[in-house]
């Protein structure tokens, strides 16, 4: 509060983290939450669309669906499980009319192809910690997506990412901490805080 923050969104990445988020949002008026399963957890934490919808409706401070998406960089979850989980999150997001918080790493084509199937649903897309290519950003802009920049954009080897964000419309750019990770230069390597 001392630095001017009015609201904070904490993101669910697993069933366990969602249980913690429910407790946190009840005791702190400025913290809101999301419900979702990170792609790395999608083979372990199997959920259905109704679970997401019911839990979101039962908690007025749950305001988003995710973090969800595809991450083919690591092999923490099977691709088919990630795709199935991502699709369920998208359907819940559309049903609730909540923003969809999307993680995409080494899966630009697959992520876009799936999101594009829902274009007519006017899905609200937030590309979390976006590090994708300019071409990927251009396609996502056609889906009216928002893009969040993390501390990565300040790293000296992020010139291509910096150029991509110059290309994105300013009213579609958000800033995120991805706390406690990805502190910006010159705090790199330290705990990242809002």
Task: Mark where each language-model region is.
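Mid-domain alpha/beta scaffold segments of enzyme catalytic cores
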Residues: 1-194
């Amino acid at each position: 509060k001392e630095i001017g923050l009015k609201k904070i969104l904490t993101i669910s990445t697993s069933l366990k983290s969602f249980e913690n988020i429910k407790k946190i949002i009840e005791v702190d008026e400025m913290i809101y939450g999301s419900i979702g399963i990170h792609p790395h957890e999608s083979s372990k934490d199997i959920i259905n669309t109704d679970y997401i919808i019911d839990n979101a409706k039962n908690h007025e401070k749950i305001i988003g669906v995710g973090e969800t998406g595809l991450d083919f960089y690591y092999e923490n979850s099977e691709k088919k499980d990630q795709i199935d989980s991502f699709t369920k999150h998208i359907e819940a997001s559309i049903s609730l009319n909540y923003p969809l918080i999307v993680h995409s790493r080494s899966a630009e084509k697959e992520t876009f192809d799936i999101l594009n199937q829902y274009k007519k649903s006017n899905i609200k897309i937030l590309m979390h910690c976006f590090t994708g290519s300019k071409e990927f950003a251009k396609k996502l802009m056609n889906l009216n997506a928002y893009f969040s920049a993390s501390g990565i954009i300040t790293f000296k080897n992020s010139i291509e990412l910096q150029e991509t964000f110059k290309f994105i419309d300013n009213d579609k750019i958000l800033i995120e901490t991805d706390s406690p990770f990805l502190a910006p230069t010159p705090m790199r390597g330290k705990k990242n805080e809002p």
